[in-house]
């Protein structure tokens, strides 16, 4: 018999695992595929710069793409078709090279000079049959605020691409573009650029896609009753400024609370409380999830019930849904 804790644990885990693909991500995946396909076939590898503000899904994009191209171990050794790394802090070329070497399972990833690390990296890129490199948080180099660092990074990256012919995707804040400005040859290689923007409300297509995402998340929650997120998409847009990361942060927090209350669906009061607790103070707007919200004030939402009981439903052979009424 499944225990109450197991059922609740599974419900909460599914909330965290929810991911909704959408048109913008699928378009970005195609661009990644095009870069990867250029390896070994095009005269020059096709590289791409992906830019966007925090919360538009840049890092999620990289993680999800990697799920479809996992590393494999064969009789010939480790194969890593897509090599990814997040630029560490402090951002130095040695640290970046070490991070890439570590992903290629180099036991000496942290050792040696930059030249030695770069030589090992070139060798391992070939041995592991790497077809695409994706570097996330590339703006960390810009945050060093040193023209010398930017010039050195741009030269190192340009040479790596030239010597290995492996296409590279750079992901970062718009400030990452400064690396390209510093090097004409590198700027030419990264002439293809993709800007990820928050979902707008004034554009019909963007607004409709935003609603579709909310509806898909609603279905994925598997509550006993639909929460109707798409019906108050305008509230979500005000709360999130069109950033899907903020939307998911609010929905996850609200869904966890609804589960704890044994509520059949996520209600506005759950979202109102999540907004108060999860939105950074400097980003605060009038709480759009309050009843009668007029966009002018923030009012504390109703407190959660003082007494909440959860019990266990006898097994029916059906996988429990989020928010199931669990009784003995």
Model-predicted segments: where are they?
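The catalytic "switch" region of P-loop NTPases
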Residues: 142, 153-231
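Walker A/P-loop nucleotide-binding motif
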Residues: 44-63
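A short hydrophobic beta-strand->loop->alpha-helix junction that borders the nucleotide-binding pocket
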Residues: 80-91
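Post-Walker A helix-loop "phosphate-sensing" segment adjacent to the P-loop in P-loop NTPases
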Residues: 67-78, 106-107
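Pre-Walker A adenine-sensing motif
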Residues: 29-41
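Mid-core helix/loop region of P-loop NTP-binding domains shared across ATPases and GTPases
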Residues: 4-10, 29, 92-96, 107-156, ...
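C-terminal alpha-helical "lid" subdomain
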Residues: 2-7, 55, 203-204, 212, ...
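Charged, amphipathic alpha-helical linker segments immediately N-terminal to NTP-binding catalytic cores
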Residues: 1-23
């Amino acid at each position: 018999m499944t225990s109450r804790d197991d059922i609740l644990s599974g419900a909460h885990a599914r909330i965290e695992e929810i991911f909704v693909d959408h048109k913008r991500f699928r378009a970005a995946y195609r661009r990644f595929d095009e870069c990867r396909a250029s390896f070994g076939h095009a005269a020059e590898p096709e590289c791409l710069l992906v830019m966007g503000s925090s919360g538009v899904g840049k890092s999620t994009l990289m993680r999800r793409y990697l799920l479809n191209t996992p590393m494999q171990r064969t009789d010939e050794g480790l194969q890593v078709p897509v090599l990814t790394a997040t630029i560490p802090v402090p951002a130095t070329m040695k640290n970046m090279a070490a991070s890439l070497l570590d992903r290629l399972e180099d036991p000496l990833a942290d050792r040696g000079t930059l030249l030695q690390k770069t030589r090992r990296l070139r060798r391992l890129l070939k041995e592991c049959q790497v077809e695409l490199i994706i570097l996330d948080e590339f703006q960390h180099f810009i945050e060093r605020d040193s023209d010398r660092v930017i010039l050195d990074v741009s030269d190192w990256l340009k040479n790596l691409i030239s010597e290995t012919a492996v296409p590279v995707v750079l992901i970062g804040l718009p400030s990452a573009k400064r690396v390209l400005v510093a090097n004409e040859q590198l700027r030419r290689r990264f002439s293809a650029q993709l800007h990820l923007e928050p979902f707008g409300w004034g554009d019909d297509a963007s607004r409709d896609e935003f609603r579709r995402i909310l509806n898909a998340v609603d279905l994925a929650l598997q509550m006993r009753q639909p929460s109707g997120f798409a019906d108050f998409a305008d509230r979500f847009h005000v709360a999130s400024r069109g950033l899907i990361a903020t939307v998911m942060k609010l929905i996850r927090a609200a869904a966890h609370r609804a589960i704890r209350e044994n509520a059949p669906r996520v209600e506005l009061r759950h979202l109102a409380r999540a907004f108060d607790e999860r939105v950074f103070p400097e980003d605060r707007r009038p709480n759009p999830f309050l009843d009668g919200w007029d966009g002018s004030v923030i009012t504390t939402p109703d407190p959660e019930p003082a007494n909440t009981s959860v019990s266990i439903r006898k097994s029916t052979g059906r996988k429990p849904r989020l928010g199931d009424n669990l009784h003995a």
